[in-house]
From Swiss-Prot:
Protein name as catalogued: Penaeidin-4c
InterPro entries in the record: Penaeidin
Keyword Disulfide bond: yes
Assigned keywords, A-Z: Amidation, Antibiotic, Antimicrobial, Chitin-binding, Disulfide bond, Fungicide, Signal
């Protein structure tokens, strides 16, 4: 009995990992825009040089206001 429960659990876990759910499968949607990994300086704007803030604003659309 334990073996059956273990096998069912492993099979369901494998299906979830592959992206299947409740018998109906569909492709995962792609993001509408590319995902960029931002440098830490863009998120923490305090104490960064103004050239770095300008670069962040130009490249990632993340305008930093120094303060």
């Amino acid at each position: 009995m334990r073996l059956v429960v273990c096998l069912v659990f492993l099979a369901s876990f494998a299906l979830v990992c592959q992206g299947y759910s409740s018998g109906y499968t569909r492709p995962l949607p792609k993001p509408s825009r590319p995902i960029f990994i931002r440098p830490i300086g863009c998120d923490v704007c305090y104490g960064i040089p103004s050239s770095t803030a300008r670069l962040c604003c130009f490249r990632y659309g993340d305008c930093c206001h120094r303060g």
